[in-house]
Amino acid sequence: MDSSTWSPATTATTEPLKPHERIRNAADISVIVIYFVVVMAVGLWAMCSTNRGTVGGFFLAGRSMVWWPVGASLFASNIGSGHFVGLAGTGAAAGIATGGFEWNALIWVVVLGWLFVPIYIKAGVVTMPEYLRKRFGGKRIQVYLSILSLMLYIFTKISADIFSGAIFITLALGLDLYLAIFLLLAITGLYTITGGLAAVIYTDTLQTAIMLVGSFILTGFAFHEVGGYDAFMEKYMNAIPTVISDGNITIKKECYTPRADSFHIFRDPLKGDLPWPGLTFGLSILALWYWCTDQVIVQRCLSAKNMSHVKAGCVMCGYFKLLPMFVIVMPGMISRVLYTEKIACTVPSECEKYCGTKVGCSNIAYPTLVVELMPNGLRGLMLSVMLASLMSSLTSIFNSASTLFTMDVYTKIRKRASEKELMIAGRLFILVLIGISIAWVPIVQSAQSGQLFDYIQSVTSYLGPPIAAVFLLAIFCKRVNEEGAFWGLVIGCMIGLARMITEFAYGTGSCVEPSNCPTIICGVHYLYFAIILFVISIIIVLVVSLFTKPIPDVHLYRLCWSLRNSKEERIDLDAEEEDIQEAPEETIEIEVPEEKKGCFRRTYDLFCGLDQQKGPKMTKEEEAAMKLKMTDTSEKPLWRTVVNINGIILLTVAVFCHAYFA
């Protein structure tokens, strides 16, 4: 069967929003409704059965989570709808190399669980900027990093997820774009606001199962349709569109033919679209930032009940990260084989006809596969998968962003805020994030360029390396001080912003219409730029630190690797300020009799976790015991051995996969 003339693709691509492409049958609608009912039921169960009335309960799930929901939540938080659209789209356009982004994580989840999380737990922190404040003292690094992280969440993570989710919804349902996005964000925000981190982790666990089952089913259908793996490799290399000219314009051959190295991860260091030194070292820097210092990821690990559960969750996530190559990237490539004219289009007028944008339609590879290939019922399941990935990713971002705002920004504005006030502030900030997200949709929509995955990774390459450098040195080099860390962050981010603003001002371009950005600025691949920026940031941090006063060890016990097992009492650099903040205004709340609350008010308080049923006030000994539990990193010898062996196996699997597909 000639892939380029396959009849369903031909009939379906002329009008993406025809009724026969939309989900209008009872089977699909029933599956979607059942999915939403189950997700809301799980969220409500978590709301009723977990402690959400304290900052520790809402933001860290009371440090009570076991390993398997932690691992599932790590995976679901990472795999958003941007992966289904971006990974599959880049796979359709350029082959399997983009799967290397997923496999690189196998190494860094081990680094996270074994090296970074023990320090964070011993430090007794809730957020990553809070760790830097304890490590270096002062407020400017904490506030600077919090605001930078919130900007990154809004303009990369949230915008990318909403954009990619919108592509799928528009293609499959034909609903009004803004109505669909508003409903998704409303439901997402609802169980994030009401349930806290426990609800997020439990719903993530459910949605991980949905994603994996649905993705495996679609992968089976796709490989069956294409004729197996060997036929897939052969047909992909011949998946060339027939329309390659428009009037006097003839597209260059390299713009529409599959790459000769499509089935290799490691590519030419100078001419490759993902050069192997960049994929090996540059990507590792981005992974260090994302997996070891990003609030969304680390917060899941901090919620685990002990270190063995942290490590087991990281290993579980690592094994899950093996799958996207086979259930997202390769199905995206198969979509190019089955619907070549649509997915591999290069002539601007043809692309605009198929997907509404002139630069290419690779982003719709996975959604097209779902709409065209899946039977009734299963198509609804796959829509649920996309909704699950979108919502789980957004809930993770909303919860972690509200944590950052509440603990690192709001407490600087309201130093004596009560526990209840902090809880309300965190929930209201989620509403603000939802509002900004909806307002950002038209900008993302107008910037549709077919370069979604590259856009996300390039922005990360420009802003992430200085943060990665500061955290790495903060933990493994105790000589680094506040001045070095601050100026390393500021100068590094200024360099990254200069490159980013220049590149986006000129436009990233495409194969058909290359960018006019000067080679000296934009000619360096973004993964190579990440390496350069990381090295510059490290040099600045070290040089400034060596020429300024060091931090005494008494302030660093259990905050850096060399002093991680110290038993001495640590004097925090901002201890006096913390003493002031630890005096919440609780006396006002005690004066309000519980009986005077009406039925509506009691229901509202229960719904939002603001009931705060007060038990007896904790004694000094009980507070010390609670603090000891929250900062305990001890492990039982048997389980420590089990997770260590699994960590070694995971690293071995990572090396094998890279070598096999090199």
From Swiss-Prot:
This is Sodium/glucose cotransporter 1. The keyword Membrane applies. Pfam families: SSF (PF00474). Belongs to the sodium:solute symporter (SSF) (TC 2.A.21) family. GO terms for molecular function: D-glucose:sodium symporter activity; galactose:sodium symporter activity; water transmembrane transporter activity. Glycans are attached at residue 248. It catalyses: D-glucose(out) + 2 Na(+)(out) = D-glucose(in) + 2 Na(+)(in); D-galactose(out) + 2 Na(+)(out) = D-galactose(in) + 2 Na(+)(in). N-glycosylation is not necessary for the cotransporter function. Electrogenic Na(+)-coupled sugar symporter that actively transports D-glucose or D-galactose at the plasma membrane, with a Na(+) to sugar coupling ratio of 2:1. Transporter activity is driven by a transmembrane Na(+) electrochemical gradient set by the Na(+)/K(+) pump. Has a primary role in the transport of dietary monosaccharides from enterocytes to blood. Responsible for the absorption of D-glucose or D-galactose across the apical brush-border membrane of enterocytes, whereas basolateral exit is provided by GLUT2. Keywords: Cell membrane, Disulfide bond, Glycoprotein, Ion transport, Membrane, Phosphoprotein, Sodium, Sodium transport, Sugar transport, Symport, Transmembrane, Transmembrane helix, Transport. The keyword Cell inner membrane does not apply. It is found in: Apical cell membrane. It is a multi-pass membrane protein. InterPro entries: Na/Glc_symporter_sf, Na/solute_symporter, Na/solute_symporter_CS. Disulfide bonds join 255-511, 255-608, 345-351, 355-361, 517-522. Residues 48-66, 118-139, 194-202, 296-309, 407-422, 478-481, 548-642 are cytoplasmic. The cholesterol-binding site is formed by transmembrane helices TM1, TM7 and TM13. The lineage of its organism: Eukaryota, Metazoa, Chordata, Craniata, Vertebrata.
